[in-house]
Amino acid sequence: MIKDKHLIDPMDFTVEELEEIFKLAHEIILDPEKFSHVCEGKILGTLFYEPSTRTRFSFEAAMMRLGGKILGFSEPNSSSASKGESLSDTIKMVSIYTDIIAMRHPKEGSAKVASLYSSVPIINAGDGGHQHPTQTLTDLLTIEMLKDGLSNHTIGICGDLKYGRTVHSLIKAMSRYKGNKFLLISPKELRIPDYIREEILRKNNIEFLEVETLEEVIDKVDILYMTRIQKERFFNEEEYLRLRDSYILNKEKMNLAKSDMIVMHPLPRVNEIACEVDYDKRAAYFKQAEYGMYARMALMAKLLGVL
């Protein structure tokens, strides 16, 4: 039972609780209309201190498709944060007016702080380069739907593995399922943080390999998870420009991959996946975005205790 829990980190839920969410998501996918009134009278607060299109729209569409309503802001200048109001005060006030809160904030650990002051469930919609657990729910649901389960996969993760919060969350989550292996593809400047390597992978004896070129491992992966080089995480413009075009997935590279491999991406993409790949049947990133809405519908329904 996950009613009234916060979702700050993908590890906040047990594997059994995640399966409960995925089971409901499957039911919603099969018959969305059946669930179109379950959140009538409920209000989602959306507090986005960082720009977002897909995550914010996904949350808002999810609540609206459940029959609920939305209050919130899409950037801090339109809130009292621009006047210097503390995060704790904002959360205390918003939790009076809403039943559940989705928050994105540039500071790592901000979602955890928010949960200490909220009287309603807090969903972390991204806190700096730290965690993005609802993207992880989206990713897991996509893998479960398209690859027949969450175990025994070789997962290639390519691009910005240092600052990419979706990457950190995905590795932590998929490490809980047996038989998964990771191929970590990045320039040396953007390798995974030490705590992921040591505390998640090595500590749990999970097989992984770090490489610098996509071509040398693309034929081995079942799931290729592409990420963009995130300009907003760089203080040095020259370093960003040098690394931006490090890895571009195109038709030629796709020809080296397995016929049943799937390509995922948390979006937005810049140029790391060529548009020609969109027409390949293995391109799953737009279906992944669609599944994200259903994952968030199931999550909010469970946290609110309406299902």
From Swiss-Prot:
EC number per UniProt: 2.1.3.2
GO molecular function, one term: aspartate carbamoyltransferase activity
Known pathway: Pyrimidine metabolism; UMP biosynthesis via de novo pathway; (S)-dihydroorotate from bicarbonate: step 2/3
Pfam family, one: OTCace
Reaction catalysis annotation: carbamoyl phosphate + L-aspartate = N-carbamoyl-L-aspartate + phosphate + H(+)
Residues binding carbamoyl phosphate, per UniProt: R54, T55, R104, H132, Q135, L267, P268
GO terms, biological process: 'de novo' pyrimidine nucleobase biosynthetic process; 'de novo' UMP biosynthetic process; amino acid metabolic process
Amino-acid positions noted as binding L-aspartate in the UniProt annotation, renumbered to this chain: K83, R165, R228
InterPro entries linked to this entry: Asp/Orn_carbamoyltranf_P-bd, Asp/Orn_carbamoylTrfase, Asp/Orn_carbamoylTrfase_sf, Asp_carbamoyltransf, Asp_carbamoyltransf_Asp/Orn-bd
Enzyme class, broadest EC rank: transferase
Protein keywords: Pyrimidine biosynthesis, Transferase
HAMAP family xrefs: Asp_carb_tr
Record text on subunit structure and interactions: Heterododecamer (2C3:3R2) of six catalytic PyrB chains organized as two trimers (C3), and six regulatory PyrI chains organized as three dimers (R2).
Task of the protein: Catalyzes the condensation of carbamoyl phosphate and aspartate to form carbamoyl aspartate and inorganic phosphate, the committed step in the de novo pyrimidine nucleotide biosynthesis pathway.
Family, similarity comment: Belongs to the aspartate/ornithine carbamoyltransferase superfamily. ATCase family.
Protein's UniProt name: Aspartate carbamoyltransferase catalytic subunit
Provenance organism: Clostridium botulinum (strain Eklund 17B / Type B)
